[in-house]
Each structure stands twice: as C-alpha cells, then as structure tokens.
A protein has these predicted regions:
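Residue-level detector of conserved catalytic or cofactor/ligand-binding positions
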Residues: 164-172
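Glycine/threonine-rich beta-strand-loop-alpha-helix active-site module
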Residues: 85-165
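Anionic group-transfer/hydrolysis microenvironments
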Residues: 56-57, 133, 168
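ATP/NTP phosphate-donor binding region
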Residues: 1-103
Length: 172
C-alpha cells in the first residue's frame, strides 16, 4: 500500500496549514526492492554516503533481505541488549559514523528511530524510516523520545522523508 503524503497537504479543520516532511509511505512486501530502486535511480540517488543504523536483532532479521542495501551503505549495528535512546547511544553513533554521511536509514523499531532522527536533526541530514515493528508513538513524528541526564523527554528532531515498511518483518 502506498500512501501519498500530498493527500494530507490541504487546509486542516483547525484552520492552520500543517507541513508534512514525509514524501512517501510504502507498506508492502516489496518495500526493500522499492528502497533499492529509489537509491539507484529514484529520489534517493543523490545521496552518496548513506548510514544505516540498526541493532543486532534487526540486523540478524534483515541481513539477507537487505544485503544489497547494506553493501552500498555504512552500516552501524548497535548492541540490542540494554539499548536506549540516550547520550551513550548517540556517542557510539557519532564516534563510529563517517564524517561525510548525507542520509540516515533507521532500520528497526522505536529506539533505533529515536536515535536516528536525533542524529539526523543534529547533523542536518535527512533520514529514511524502515520500521520493523509497530510503533507506539509514530515513525513520522518530529520529536525523539530520549533519555538525557537520567530523564526521559521528547526533544526536537526531524521526520523521515520516506517510510518504507518491511511488512513481513513488522507483522506480529
């Protein structure tokens, strides 16, 4: 199923006009092939130094399926055990990512997305959402749920430019 974000770009009943950063939402079994196509010849072809952020569980579940995408990106696999969207995780990403990243692909669930959107916001690069589990607060939000200085809070971040759901991974 393809959701055209332009369908939502109309005056709201509240009287305000809301901006939508997401250009496309695709939820189907062929989402990986669509992502490969977009990276090769579509709207993502301009990005030459993408970074994939995922955790050990997600990497194991998607390694074969996303092999071609992983081959063309820097892939940063975070340890899933005890992983939190906090300063420690941010520091791990910052210490291990290449300096010239121009796109982030968040492959995983909520914590990976919060880390990715926070990094994308701080480095002013777009990110792609590749959810592998249902979300409690939304993959297209413009805030990240971060634990900073021991306190969980929402901080300004960025919405993805595209959501490509791996439906057979994210099904319960």
């Amino acid at each position: 199923m393809r959701v055209d974000a332009d369908d939502f770009a109309r005056p709201c009943s509240c009287g305000r006009e809301h901006q939508i950063a997401v250009k496309e939402i695709l939820i189907e079994a062929g989402a990986v092939e669509k992502l490969e196509e977009e990276m090769s010849e579509g709207m993502l072809r301009e990005y030459i130094s993408p970074l994939v952020i995922c955790d050990t569980n997600t990497y194991a579940a998607t390694e074969e399926l996303m092999e071609d995408i992983y081959d063309r990106c820097q892939v940063l696999v975070l340890d899933a055990e005890g992983l939190q969207a906090d300063r420690h995780a941010i520091k791990i990403v910052e210490n291990n990512m290449e300096e010239d990243i121009d796109l982030i692909l968040a492959v995983g669930a909520g914590t990976i997305h919060d880390i990715s959107r926070y990094i994308a916001h701080n480095y002013k690069v777009p990110f792609i959402s590749v959810p592998t589990a249902a979300s409690g607060d939304g993959f297209v939000t413009t805030v990240a749920a971060m634990t900073l200085d021991g306190v969980k809070k929402t901080v300004p971040s960025v919405a993805p430019i595209c959501v490509l759901s791996l439906i057979h991974i994210s099904e319960p």
